[in-house]
């Protein structure tokens, strides 16, 4: 079934949101999940808060709708998204709740692992040695490292 578009000039086949290329032919809720740190539930909530139709394709959105989506994703607490919905609650550094996206998520995870290694915790040492971290058995598995 081919995709029918009303105005041929306004459709974008590839969008650039938060340093991520997004396919414009996918519905907006699923297209937002291509951004690292955004799942289906968070994408659904952001679209509802931004008053964007979930049936629209990502390439059909106007620039104003895209800006609304990005501002809600970057500042979720300003739009009454609860703290339990965020992916970084009670941060170790300042104790605040954040929703970390895209490149910031990778750097935060790397910083967390470095902190664990620095304080010589059990998890940090296991990461440093390249072993399983969460209590799995290692007698016969994971010998390739």
From Swiss-Prot:
Entry's Gene Ontology cellular component terms: cytosol; small ribosomal subunit
Keyword Cell cycle belongs to the record: no
Family that this chain belongs to: Belongs to the universal ribosomal protein uS13 family.
MF annotations from Gene Ontology: RNA binding; structural constituent of ribosome
UniProt name for this protein: Small ribosomal subunit protein uS13
A Gene Ontology BP annotation from the UniProt entry: translation
Record note on quaternary structure: Component of the small ribosomal subunit. Mature ribosomes consist of a small (40S) and a large (60S) subunit. The 40S subunit contains about 32 different proteins and 1 molecule of RNA (18S). The 60S subunit contains 45 different proteins and 3 molecules of RNA (25S, 5.8S and 5S).
Function text: Component of the ribosome, a large ribonucleoprotein complex responsible for the synthesis of proteins in the cell. The small ribosomal subunit (SSU) binds messenger RNAs (mRNAs) and translates the encoded message by selecting cognate aminoacyl-transfer RNA (tRNA) molecules. The large subunit (LSU) contains the ribosomal catalytic site termed the peptidyl transferase center (PTC), which catalyzes the formation of peptide bonds, thereby polymerizing the amino acids delivered by tRNAs into a polypeptide chain.
Annotated gene: RPS18
Record's keyword terms, sorted: Cytoplasm, Ribonucleoprotein, Ribosomal protein
Main location, first listed in the record: cytoplasm
Phosphoprotein in keyword set: no
Protein location: Cytoplasm
């Amino acid at each position: 079934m081919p995709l029918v578009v009303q105005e041929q000039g306004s459709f974008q086949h590839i969008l650039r949101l938060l340093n991520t290329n997004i396919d414009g032919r996918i519905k907006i809720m699923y297209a937002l999940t291509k951004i690292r740190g955004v799942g289906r539930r968070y994408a659904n909530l952001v679209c509802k808060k931004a008053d964007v139709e979930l049936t629209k394709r990502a390439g059909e959105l106007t620039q104003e709708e895209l800006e609304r989506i990005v501002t809600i994703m970057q500042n979720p607490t300003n739009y009454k998204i609860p703290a339990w919905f965020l992916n970084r609650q009670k941060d170790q550094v300042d104790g605040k709740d954040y929703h970390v996206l895209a490149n910031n998520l990778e750097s935060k995870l790397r910083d967390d692992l470095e902190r664990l290694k620095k304080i010589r915790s059990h998890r940090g040492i296991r990461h440093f040695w390249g072993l399983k971290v969460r209590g799995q058995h290692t007698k016969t598995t994971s010998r390739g490292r």
